[in-house]
Amino acid sequence: MKALYLLGLLAFLYSCSSENVYDLQPESSEEENPGTFLEAIQEQSRTCVPRDGDCTENRKACCRSKIFQDRCQCRKVSQDKVACSCKQPYWLMKIEEILGDIPEKPKPVEGKCVKKHHDCSQRKNDCCPGSMENYTCKCYNTLEEGAKESEICGCVSKADHQILAQGFRYVKRLHDLR
């Protein structure tokens, strides 16, 4: 099991390092019109080379597969000619076969999602994604005045859930001691 976690961590780190990194400093010709620099990046991300397509002109333009980005692999055709095509390394292909299809999140109602720490009791599957991890709707039983139990729900991360659950258990224990 530890080996599987290690393999997953290595695959995640490798995929993070494979993403294209753009220099955010505009070049001298682009200083006059800053919109062209962003437009060029957006156009480059829209036009990617599919698997087995020719990537001789732009070796960083290979499309992403389900999880990982394909690599441009070149081979010598003749003395002075090189042919390049987008391929996926064998071990990355095997990792994708093991992991299978990654299910997509259900679309939120009316194009909006429930923000972090907001009430999600009506829409439990529509929490907004976070920057580092996804939020899930968790519900907690609370004691109101008069020892009446009620349930509150909110979109929280895993760490927030552990902290909140421990806090509610602690308060309930204090209430039971009275």
From Swiss-Prot:
Q: Propeptide residues, per UniProt?
A: 19-46
Listed InterPro entries: Spider_toxin_CSTX_knottin, Spider_toxin_CSTX_Knottin_CS
- UniProt cross-references to Pfam families, sorted A to Z: Toxin_35 (PF10530)
**The UniProt record lists the keyword Secreted:** yes
Which key words tag this protein in UniProt?
Disulfide bond, Secreted, Signal, Toxin
- Cysteines paired by S-S bonds: 48-63, 55-72, 62-86, 74-84, 113-128, 120-137, 127-155, 139-153
Q: Which domain of life is it from?
A: Eukaryota
Q: What is this protein called?
A: DELTA-miturgitoxin-Cp3a
Source species = Cheiracanthium punctorium (Yellow sac spider)
